[in-house]
Regions:
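Glycoside hydrolase catalytic-domain groove-lining segments
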Residues: 66-78, 158-184, 195-260, 279-284, ...
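C-terminal outer-membrane/trafficking sorting elements
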Residues: 336-415
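Boundary/entry segment of secreted carbohydrate-active catalytic domains
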Residues: 5-50
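Structural preference for beta-strand elements that scaffold enzyme active sites
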Residues: 23-27, 44-46, 81-83, 123-127, ...
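Short, acidic/polar
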Residues: 29-41, 105-116, 193-205, 274-279
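Aromatic-rich peripheral "rim/lid" segments of glycoside hydrolase catalytic domains that contact
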Residues: 10-16, 57, 115, 127, ...
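Substrate-binding cleft and catalytic face of glycoside hydrolase catalytic domains
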Residues: 33, 40-58, 66-188, 252-258
Length: 415
């Protein structure tokens, strides 16, 4: 599932959003720097900073809604899904709440929830808590500004270890009964222990029917140099919760860590290669129902790292041109749609041979290494099974089956 075969269509629209007509959205953030040509590319909206409590109510009881109003209007005027980012977080929170008594803090949190609910009655996806593992609303020291310092008002760790998150979601269910509730976190695709911790929290929320969606941020610092098999494995752990998954804050730099590209061509090709390696893992996964990029124009938060997809003159970088073509050409399935079932045996491989059952609808079988490099390709011609000779060094590989539209991937162990 590292990269699907792209079929060239005779015509790919350059005037409507990239994912128009697709079962999954491909969205982006609302900010002044990202507005130009937004509707030409994207069909979902999340405010970058406008929905953070510290942006709206920097001064107690003085509300600044204008930017959040504009983000919401952009979504609703164009029938794009709107994700509210974010109610509870340990960053960019009002400084005035930090030293209030806990009971008063809780009352202010309720007022914040109520104000958002009243002003924006049709929020599609409500990000209740952002970064519960990484950045809870706890003041660590005097230099920790913007944390909110209200974790205790929400119950602290409590008996579950996550009482404050559970309270946040209970309040969200109360004030936003029509919205889908989502939690969000980063550095999941690169860390299985962290992913398992996140799944534990999700299961606590599921036990009270408090959560509808799961967010994975997808920033490049969590996918750079991470094997495709690791990304997919951790994504599958989260998908096993049987909740829809959203990639909430996706970006890819045009350089490796602490590396400066020699020239624009090198930068473009690096970013393009990483988009081809990483994006299909998420886009083709049947549990992933949408991807939100965290900016695409100069002025986005990772401009210095070269993550923008559009140049300063407005021209598209190669990764953006590829993204439009790829999404247009790739037919994806969602979790509740019928998917082909295939089995591998023996797995681990014995004597360099493996048999694949259930290939009657399959056109191609590819063997990839864990970095996504294609090692073998086999045409199946709709046979019910296929046997392969695998003269491969010991290790973990990916075996990818494609019906010409969608690909399906499993891990294969060669001892």
């Amino acid at each position: 599932m590292v990269q699907a075969e792209i079929q060239h269509h005779a015509r790919i629209s350059a005037t409507e959003p990239i994912a128009a007509g697709k079962p999954k959205f491909l969205g982006n953030i609302y900010s002044t720097a990202q507005l130009s040509d937004f509707k030409r590319y994207w069909n979902q909206v999340a405010p970058e900073n406008a929905g953070k409590w510290g942006s709206v109510e920097a001064t107690r009881d003085v509300m600044s809604w204008s930017s959040l109003d504009a983000a919401y209007k952009l979504a609703k005027d164009n029938n794009f899904p709107f994700r509210m980012h974010v109610l509870v977080w340990g960053n960019q929170q009002p400084s005035w709440i930090e030293n209030l008594p806990a009971a008063e803090q809780l009352q202010e949190i309720r007022e914040w929830f109520a104000a958002v609910a009243e002003r924006y009655p049709d929020i599609d996806h409500l990000e209740v808590v952002n970064e519960p593992i990484s950045d809870p609303p706890r003041k660590v020291n005097s230099a920790d500004q913007g944390s909110g310092n209200y974790i205790g008002a929400l119950g602290g760790s409590g008996t579950t270890g996550w009482d404050w998150v559970l309270t946040s979601f209970r309040l969200a269910r109360e004030y936003f009964p029509k919205s889908k509730l989502i939690v969000n976190e980063y550095n999941l695709t690169s860390s299985t222990p962290r992913t398992q911790q996140y799944v534990g929290l999700i299961n606590l929320l599921k036990a009270e029917n408090l959560i509808d969606l799961v967010g994975i941020q997808g920033h490049y610092f969590s996918t750079r140099n991470v094997p495709a098999a690791t990304i997919l494995s951790n994504l599958n752990l989260i998908a096993a919760t049987n909740l829809p998954v959203y990639i909430t804050e996706f970006d890819i730099d045009d350089r490796g860590l602490n590396q400066t590209p020699a020239n624009r061509t090198q930068a473009d090709q690096y970013q393009l290669g990483e988009y081809k390696r990483i994006f299909p893992i998420f886009w083709e996964h049947p549990s992933v129902q949408g991807v939100t990029l965290w900016g695409f124009r100069p002025g986005m938060w990772r401009t210095d790292q070269g993550a923008m997809l559009v140049n300063t003159d407005g021209s598209e970088r190669p990764a953006l041109a590829w993204l439009r073509e790829y999404v247009s050409a790739t037919v994806t399935s969602l979790h509740n749609e019928m998917q082909p079932s295939f089995t591998l045996y023996p797995n681990p491989v014995t004597n360099g041979r493996v048999r694949i059952e259930g290939t009657d609808k399959i056109k191609w079988i590819r063997i990839l290494d864990v970095q996504g490099k294609q090692l073998q390709v086999h045409e199946v011609a709709h046979q019910s099974f296929h046997s392969l000779e695998l003269p491969l060094a010991p290790g973990v590989y990916l075996i990818q089956l494609s019906d010409g539209r969608t690909s399906f991937t499993k891990r294969l162990l060669v001892p």
